[in-house]
Amino acid sequence: MEGLAIRASRPSVFCSIPGLGGDSHRKPPSDGFLKLPASSIPADSRKLVANSTSFHPISAVNVSAQASLTADFPALSETILKEGRNNGKEKAENIVWHESSICRCDRQQLLQQKGCVVWITGLSGSGKSTVACALSKALFERGKLTYTLDGDNVRHGLNRDLTFKAEHRTENIRRIGEVAKLFADVGVICIASLISPYRRDRDACRSLLPDGDFVEVFMDVPLHVCESRDPKGLYKLARAGKIKGFTGIDDPYEAPVNCEVVLKHTGDDESCSPRQMAENIISYLQNKGYLEG
């Protein structure tokens, strides 16, 4: 027998603790479990508990003597009081940024490239993921280190708790933007490929990085072309009313105004090939010095 788990079931047990508001009598606020090592419980007590149907240990004590707690444990008291007032949702305080002994320029020198974020945005079916893969491969062949954050892939892990509601979409973009920023700081060329329909969300991600390190790539493909491709069958479902809030159908897509690269669909197979589009992005990165240490 390794230990004993005792369940507390909100009994009407009243208690007082010397120095912590002895006159305050309150019920335990919630059910809970108290796990004790078997060695710390006398054999007779273990037998008593095992045979009892009405044993109710105290699960918690609600302390009301804040003055005494504050006097004796000021730091702990402040944390407890803040957590109580804000249900644990208050932004963390008393945190300090720790500088690294290796700076971004050191990592970029090692990799012989400069970190940045290539943010590919456009309608579903515009070819974002395809171009992202082509770009990653082309840069890899040049000896450059990249990492791709695909919108669908990220929702399998980091953002699996998010839906497609407007506020969740904003949080989805925010998280990906923060992760992309970390990759860029390492010196990696981070390729983010996702619809990201709202300008304010894309601009918020841009503001996370130094000027020039956010390269917005707009897949300028007409809706009718994207809908004719419909690789996932989502447009068909949206038209049938089975998907609500689908970008381009019953939710807007806000095209970039001053993006760095526009990949426009012209109908010409050669100029619209994923490889050629990737080369257009690489030309921009090359001209801006991102492919050099």
UniProtKB/Swiss-Prot annotation:
Belongs to the APS kinase family. It is found in: Plastid, Chloroplast. One of its GO terms (biological process) is cysteine biosynthetic process. Keywords: Amino-acid biosynthesis, ATP-binding, Chloroplast, Cysteine biosynthesis, Kinase, Nucleotide-binding, Plastid, Transferase, Transit peptide. Expressed in root vasculature, root tips, leaf epidermal cells and funiculus of developing seeds. Disruption phenotype: No visible phenotype under normal growth conditions. Apk1 and apk2 double mutant exhibits a semi-dwarf phenotype. Substrate binds at D152, R155, R169, N172, I195, S196, G245. This is Adenylyl-sulfate kinase 2, chloroplastic. PANTHER family: ADENYLYL-SULFATE KINASE 2, CHLOROPLASTIC, BIFUNCTIONAL 3'-PHOSPHOADENOSINE 5'-PHOSPHOSULFATE SYNTHASE. The active site is at S196 (phosphoserine intermediate). Its EC number is 2.7.1.25. It is an enzyme of class 2 (transferase). Gene3D superfamilies: P-loop containing nucleotide triphosphate hydrolases. NCBIfam families: apsK, PRK03846.1. It comes from Arabidopsis thaliana (Mouse-ear cress). Interacts with APK1. One of its GO terms (cellular component) is chloroplast. The lineage of its organism: Eukaryota, Viridiplantae, Streptophyta, Embryophyta, Tracheophyta. Catalyzes the synthesis of activated sulfate. Essential for plant reproduction and viability. Required for the production of glucosinolates. InterPro entries: APS_kinase (IPR002891), P-loop_NTPase (IPR027417). Pathway: Sulfur metabolism; hydrogen sulfide biosynthesis; sulfite from sulfate: step 2/3. GO terms for molecular function: adenylylsulfate kinase activity; ATP binding.
